[in-house]
């Protein structure tokens, strides 16, 4: 299943190398194939259960840009900042953009920020994808260049703090 990373999270492109499988050519080259596996989550799935199993999935290699999200809001006007329901976005939603459909000068290729979970989910759905689950996100974020789970490595911790 394809999974798209939105920048209300963080970019993982440099942290995926231990989890990333060879690209099978069936999905966009903008996505990394993350191998499935098992790990201990900081949020156990059930009382007394420590290990979580993750099936393989795909994750965008780079954050969603303002230009990409602007294209989405032009195609899905209900997600424009001047039309979105307040239930789905707060008053900071895309507040730094020049207009309801244009990011403004110099920020088109920067990561989009100040989007809600609902808007991020709708963006993914429009692309035929979904947001990663908590466990998928945690699993991918725990990887370093040399370890599938580097959370106990002080050097890795310094790179993410």
Q: PLM features: residue spans?
A:
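Mature N-terminal segment immediately following signal peptide/propeptide cleavage
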Residues: 30-38
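Short beta-strand segments in beta-sandwich/barrel cores
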Residues: 38-39, 129
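Active-site microenvironments of metalloenzymes and redox enzymes
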Residues: 56-155
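Positively charged n-region of N-terminal signal peptides that target proteins for export
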Residues: 1-4
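Short glycine-aromatic motifs
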Residues: 26-31, 129
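Short, polar loop/linker segments at the starts of domains and inter-domain junctions
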Residues: 41-56
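Bacterial N-terminal signal peptides
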Residues: 7-15
């Amino acid at each position: 299943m394809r999974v798209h990373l939105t920048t209300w999270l963080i970019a993982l492109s440099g942290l995926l190398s231990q989890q990333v499988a060879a690209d099978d050519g069936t999905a966009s080259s903008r996505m990394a194939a993350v191998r499935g596996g098992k790990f201990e989550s900081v949020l156990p799935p059930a009382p007394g259960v420590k290990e979580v199993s993750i099936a393989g999935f795909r994750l965008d290699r780079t954050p969603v840009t303002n230009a990409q999200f602007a294209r989405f809001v032009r195609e899905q006007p209900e997600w424009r900042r001047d039309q979105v329901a307040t239930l789905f976005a707060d008053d900071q939603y895309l507040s730094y953009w020049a207009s309801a459909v244009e990011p403004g000068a110099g920020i088109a290729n920067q990561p989009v920020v100040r989007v809600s979970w609902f808007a991020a989910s709708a963006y993914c759905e429009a692309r035929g994808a979904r947001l990663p689950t908590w466990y998928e996100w945690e699993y991918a974020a725990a990887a370093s260049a040399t370890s599938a789970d580097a959370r106990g490595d002080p050097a890795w911790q310094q790179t993410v703090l």
